[in-house]
Amino acid sequence: LRANHQIILEVLRKISKDQIVMAFVATCIEATARQLNTSYNEVFQRMERIGLIDNYILPNYEPLHSESREVLVQRLIECLINWENRL
C-alpha cells in the first residue's frame, strides 16, 4: 500500500500545471454540457466562438476551480448566455 502511494505521488508530481488547468477546462465543458443536456462538442464550439475559454475560464482558473461544481456550472452557463447575447 505504501509503495502504491509513493508511485501515485510521483506521477502527480510529474503532471504539469498546464495539464491540470486543461483538465479543469475539459471538466468545465463536460459539466456545462451535461447541465444543458447537449453535447460536449456543441458547448466547446459555443465557448470557443465567444472566447469564453481563453478570456474567462483560463484567466480565472484559481478562483473558479475552488467553486463547487454546481456554482461553477451555473456561472459558466450565465456567462455563456450573456456573452452570446452580446454578439
Predicted regions mapped to residue ranges:
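Amphipathic, hydrophobic secondary-structure cores in small proteins
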Residues: 33-35, 39-64
